[in-house]
């Protein structure tokens, strides 16, 4: 058996056992194409989730209870031979062949530090609501518009991620956006429009249930990455982006209810 190439981190509170199983199984399917280390970060009291993860071959790490960014960073700290990082939530999925596809994209050019693919938005029953596959447009909008790079469905070179210090533990919603903006200084981004992941859209998803707080945190992150001279006027475009994001979320909820 060759050394693992991809470190997949899955943080969970352990309260979604049915979808957690599906998420872990979707990662295990990737082992047909490449070697993967799956780290499940979960609290000590999540006994059933820990047992489930262990039975399915994951490495279980204790959640430090300092927020989701700190949990992911704990997973990153377990790195051994892996070159790449990928994330999956406890109700997300990696599509068959998804990690291998992302690896081929990120390895196309030596200066690439991040690769992302399309992401299916699915309802609680797994039916596709819509697909996010913005490609190059996502990179153009990143610093001022909506973040269209899906965290599930992204692969990052671990050396570059460690150079930026991992994920900011003070952030609850936009830690991926902050990392993406920092990573631009370390190399280029590449993409495929092929769906490589699925995000389960339901009312208690962290960013779905807390849309306003998520938008405000994202605006704060984007503002601090702007040139100092234009930060005071960033509200001119951040507010319309917030409105557009809320409108898109409303349409997503409507589509989910209509299925």
Segments (PLM) and residue ranges:
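A conserved acidic beta->alpha catalytic loop
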Residues: 40-50
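Conserved nucleotide-sugar donor-binding catalytic segment
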Residues: 136-217
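Cell-envelope/extracellular polymer assembly enzymes that use nucleotide-activated donors
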Residues: 4-7, 37, 178
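Short beta-strand-to-loop acidic/aromatic patch adjacent to the donor-nucleotide binding site
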Residues: 82-93
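Short, acidic, metal-binding catalytic loop of nucleotide-sugar glycosyltransferases
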Residues: 24-35
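N-proximal low-complexity "stem/linker" segments adjacent to membrane-targeting elements
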Residues: 1-26
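Conserved donor NDP-sugar-binding/catalytic core segment of glycosyltransferases
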Residues: 93, 97-129
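Glycine-rich, basic loop-to-helix element that forms the pyrophosphate-binding segment
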Residues: 63-81
């Amino acid at each position: 058996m060759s050394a693992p190439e991809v470190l997949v981190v899955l943080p969970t509170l352990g309260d979604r056992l049915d979808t957690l199983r599906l998420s872990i199984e979707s990662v295990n399917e990737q082992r047909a194409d490449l070697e993967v280390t799956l780290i499940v970060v979960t609290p000590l009291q999540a006994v059933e989730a820990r047992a489930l993860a262990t039975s399915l071959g994951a490495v279980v790490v204790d959640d430090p209870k300092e927020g989701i960014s700190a949990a992911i960073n704990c997973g990153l700290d377990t790195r051994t031979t892996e070159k790449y990082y990928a994330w999956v939530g406890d109700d997300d999925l990696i599509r068959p062949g998804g990690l291998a596809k992302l690896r081929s994209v990120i390895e196309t050019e030596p200066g690439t530090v991040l690769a992302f693919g399309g992401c299916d938005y699915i309802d609680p029953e797994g039916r596709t609501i819509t697909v996010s596959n913005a490609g190059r447009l996502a990179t153009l909008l990143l610093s001022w518009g909506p973040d269209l790079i899906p965290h599930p469905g992204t692969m990052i070179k671990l050396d570059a991620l460690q150079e930026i210090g991992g994920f900011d533990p003070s952030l609850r919603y936009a830690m991926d956006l902050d990392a993406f903006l920092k990573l631009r200084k370390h190399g280029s981004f590449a993409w495929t429009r092929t769906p490589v992941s699925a995000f389960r859209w339901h009312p208690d998803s962290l960013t779905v249930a807390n849309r306003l707080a998520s938008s405000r945190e994202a605006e704060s992150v984007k503002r601090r990455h702007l040139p100092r001279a234009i930060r005071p006027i960033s509200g001119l475009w951040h507010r319309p982006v917030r409105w557009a994001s809320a409108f898109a979320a409303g349409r997503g909820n409507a589509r989910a209810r209509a299925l």
